[in-house]
Regions:
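Periplasmic/ER-lumenal interhelical loops and adjacent helix-loop junctions
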Residues: 44-65, 246-316, 361, 365, ...
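Signature aromatic-anchored transmembrane alpha helix within multi-pass, membrane-resident enzymes
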Residues: 214, 234-242, 382, 388-438
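Membrane-interface coil-to-helix junctions
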Residues: 25-123, 147, 151-156, 160-166, ...
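Hydrophobic alpha-helical membrane-interfacial segments at the cytosolic entry of transmembrane helices
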Residues: 17-24, 193-194, 226-250, 327-335, ...
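Membrane-embedded helix bundles of polyisoprenyl
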Residues: 22, 115-134, 138-221, 237-241, ...
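Extracytoplasmic
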Residues: 261-272, 429-589
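Perimembrane helix-loop-helix junctions
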Residues: 4-6, 178-180, 209-242, 313-322, ...
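Hydrophobic, aromatic-rich transmembrane alpha-helices
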Residues: 302-338, 389
Length: 589
């Protein structure tokens, strides 16, 4: 197997150059984000900014808790007074790496965007390490890292921050393959660390990676004779990964089981892939012209990548030293592709995904099985890179000439010499096609509302209310779609400045108490709405007058249960205090 130990052990300042290249690529592929790095956040292909704004709030909450040693981490200030509100969504504790930016700057966008660019650079670097290990070639490793940094799925989902983080997946595969090559215990330990970090950065990716490995890993384990070291290393990896994952996963599972959440089958089916989705891409190239009416998600890695992946698979299977890793990558790809179909996956008249959802904790809560497609695209890039693996090479090669020789040796050995060079340059052209076809369009950007315009009411709330007071931003969302909650996530952004608990909020799941309260306050400020808010512990109502229906605005002065405490100069934002009933003493835990 070409995944040589020395391919990753060459610690040399040259890696700084690689990181610099990936940084330039990350900035260029997300441009013009860098020009508005402290004022806007990318939305990718998201129609609205709800999810990016929610992740912006998540970055702040992790930074806020990091400053307090992560005390009360799960009791996030949303859906108050509900407990463990942060367990309702992706926690992303890895975003704490940009906590100093949050602490020293009022720009939440700056921290968010620096984290995003860092993760894209990490994708490129981790990809180059993995591909270099597979091919024993630094130049091919850089090209592979670039292709993984530009992965179509990531840039399509650029508005979903956690889905931009591939490095955990790539490093897990890298150290796992290294361990199964040489049985070094440090590789087993690092595989466990990488798996754990994968889950921390993106719960979806961590879960999908572990589930796919469960079915694909036996190919790498077959015919391994050193059972003792295999068992020891496997135990180390599992223990280390569990030690990292369980402190996050257990509270999430506990909260989920307490609320008995399961996704609606029609929702999961709607967000599952179909085979035709793998023929569609948003970017340039022949497959981008697909108009198949059945295709809904652009999941294709591109024609050039698909073609080169087939070539790499054939070349990898022909070589003894790459045969097993090629079989593993092929099975990894097939399993991920089938799982991406969700309930639509039919095998011998049965639906395997539904059976798995009954037995595997957490799978029944998965909303978007089509996200398994990211593993399909990663597998295609890795298989394509195997086209460049040398035959029986003991030393890593570092230049383009050597890469060309590796191509000729691996794929043209059985052909006449005059065809070898043509094949060599043909494959180089295909790899260039992969990069060109993967180059994304400019991402959509959401310009954050100006804080200075909101400063008066935010500062009043921060100085005139108690830290434990509960605030309701009104009106509440009336719908259930993501777009209906954009105003709510803007309110969550302002809460990062006034730091008061919110009665409303947005998350992957919603507490039942909030769902009931939401239904009860749709006619605010009628008596029922105010009484229900009061019973929920709400003391302050921040009312966006422009968003409230005109008849309801007219009701505000006549509502005896509310007293106006503050109004902005333009009259658009009012803060009301909910008056307690007679002989009622406000008490808060």
């Amino acid at each position: 197997m070409p995944h040589q130990q020395n391919a990753a052990e060459h610690v040399h300042p040259v890696w700084l150059w690689d990181v610099f290249v990936f940084l330039l690529l990350a900035v260029a592929s997300t441009w013009p984000l860098a020009s508005q790095i402290d004022a806007a956040i990318p939305t990718g292909r998201e129609r609205v900014a709800t999810v990016p704004l929610f992740n912006l709030w998540t970055v702040w909450w992790n930074a806020d808790r990091a400053a307090e040693g992560f005390a009360n981490y799960w009791n996030a200030p949303i859906f108050a007074p509900a407990e463990n509100a942060f367990a309702l969504s992706e926690t992303q504790p890895t975003t704490a790496v940009v906590a100093p930016v949050v602490w020293t700057s009022e720009s939440r966008a700056l921290a968010y965007n620096l984290y995003l660019l860092t993760m894209l650079v990490a994708n490129g670097w981790a990809g180059s390490v993995l591909v270099r290990g597979l091919t024993n070639n630094r130049f091919v490793g850089i090209c592979g890292g670039a292709a993984l940094l530009l992965l179509p799925f990531v840039h399509w989902q650029l508005g979903v921050l956690q889905l931009a983080q591939l490095s955990g997946i790539l490093l897990t595969l890298h150290f796992l393959i290294r361990f199964l090559t040489d049985y070094r215990m440090n590789d087993a330990l690092l595989a466990g660390v990488a798996t754990g970090l994968c889950y921390l950065s993106c719960n979806y990716y961590g879960y999908q990676l572990c589930l796919t490995l469960l079915f694909a890993l036996p190919v790498l384990l077959a015919k391994r004779c050193n059972v003792r070291r295999l068992a020891t290393g496997g135990a180390i990896a599992v223990v280390v990964a569990s030690a990292i994952i369980l402190p996050i996963a257990l509270p999430q599972l506990s909260t989920s089981s307490r609320h008995s959440w399961d996704r609606r089958s029609e929702t999961v089916s709607r967000l599952s892939a179909v085979q035709d989705d793998y023929l569609r891409t948003l970017w340039r190239g022949p497959l981008s012209c697909s108009t198949n009416s059945k295709a809904r998600f652009p999941l294709s890695p591109g024609l050039a990548c698909s073609t080169l992946a087939i070539v790499g698979a054939v070349a990898g299977l022909r070589r003894k030293d790459t045969r097993r890793v090629t079989l593993f990558l092929l099975l990894f790809l097939v399993v991920a592709a089938q799982l991406s179909l969700g309930p639509r996956w039919v095998f011998l008249g049965q639906r395997p995904f539904e059976y798995l959802a009954e037995w595997l904790p957490g799978l029944s809560a998965m909303r978007s099985p089509h996200r398994f497609a990211v593993l399909v695209q990663v597998s295609c890039i890795l298989l394509a890179s195997l086209s460049f693996a040398p035959v029986n090479s003991e030393e890593a090669v570092d230049d383009r000439c050597a890469a060309g020789k590796a191509l000729a040796a691996s794929l043209a050995a059985s052909l006449s010499a005059k065809w070898g060079r043509a094949i060599q340059w043909g494959l180089v052209a295909l790899y260039c096609g992969v990069l060109a076809e993967s180059w994304p369009e400019q991402p959509g950007l959401y310009a954050l509302p100006a804080y200075d315009q909101q400063r008066p009411w935010i500062e009043w709330l921060r100085t005139e209310t108690q830290p434990d007071d509960i605030v309701a931003n009104l009106p509440f969302s009336s719908g259930r779609s993501v777009s209906d909650y954009q105003d709510t996530t803007v309110s969550m952004l302002w809460s990062t400045y006034h730091k008061r608990r919110l009665a409303n909020g947005y998350s992957g799941f919603f507490p039942k108490e909030f769902v009931r309260l939401k239904a009860d306050v749709q006619n605010f400020p009628d008596d029922k709405s105010v009484v229900e808010l009061r019973m929920a512990g709400v003391r302050w109502c921040v009312v966006d007058v422009d968003k409230l229906p005109s008849p309801n605005v007219g009701m505000l002065p006549d509502q005896s249960l509310l007293s106006l405490q503050f109004e902005t100069g333009d009259g658009k934002t009012r803060i009301y205090k909910i008056e307690p009933p007679a002989e009622f003493d406000w008490k808060f835990d």
